[in-house]
Curated annotation (Swiss-Prot):
Pathway: Pyrimidine metabolism; dUMP biosynthesis; dUMP from dCTP (dUTP route): step 2/2
Recorded family membership: Belongs to the dUTPase family.
SUPFAM superfamilies, A to Z: dUTPase-like
Function: This enzyme is involved in nucleotide metabolism: it produces dUMP, the immediate precursor of thymidine nucleotides and it decreases the intracellular concentration of dUTP so that uracil cannot be incorporated into DNA.
A GO MF label: dUTP diphosphatase activity
Catalytic activity entry: dUTP + H2O = dUMP + diphosphate + H(+)
Pfam families given in the database record: dUTPase (PF00692)
Keywords: Hydrolase, Magnesium, Metal-binding, Nucleotide metabolism
Native organism: Salmonella paratyphi B (strain ATCC BAA-1250 / SPB7)
Keyword Metal-binding: yes
Name by which UniProt lists this protein: Deoxyuridine 5'-triphosphate nucleotidohydrolase
Disulphide bonds in the chain: none
């Protein structure tokens, strides 16, 4: 299913010098977001920085949200992940997409202008209404959590 989402280009290099986000394959779930930087940024081990994408989106549909996720290769090979682990973009947000990047690796990492730094996935949203109760109906699991089912 394809859905149209309003996007605003905030930096004229996006779509020219830096490609617009696209799906790499027909089966891709995520769109790659790029670093819209003037110069390379050196990120020391343990450091975080906010990187602009040069884009703003307005999802508008309250049954959708977007999540920003790390790129698997950056995390596995270089220890580069999102500073907030997952970024949530609500349907009514209209500001620039900024990516919080954390270097959890042992070496400095350089973020180059135009580099693919994160991916964005659109997800369905269900807003819940709480029903206050005194007790729950019993289930097999009950209150068991955090490893209650073992490792094997």
């Amino acid at each position: 299913m394809m859905k149209k989402i309003d996007v605003k280009i905030l930096d004229p290099r996006v779509g020219q010098q830096f490609p617009l986000p696209t799906y790499a394959t027909s089966g891709s779930a995520g769109l790659d977001l790029r670093a819209c930087l003037d110069d390379a940024v050196e990120l020391a081990p343990g450091a975080t920085t906010l990187v602009p994408t040069g884009l703003a989106i307005h999802i508008a549909d309250p049954s959708l949200a977007a999540v920003m996720l790390p790129r698997s290769g950056l995390g596995h090979k270089h220890g580069i992940v999102l500073g907030n682990l997952v970024g949530l973009i609500d349907s009514d947000y209209q500001g620039q997409l900024m990516v919080s990047i954390w270097n959890r690796g042992q070496d400095s990492f350089t973020i180059e202008p135009g580099e693919r730094i994160a991916q964005m996935v659109f997800v369905p949203v269900v807003q819940a209404e709480f029903n206050l109760v005194e007790a729950f109906d019993a289930t097999e699991r009950g209150e068991g959590g955090f490893g209650h089912s073992g490792r094997k």
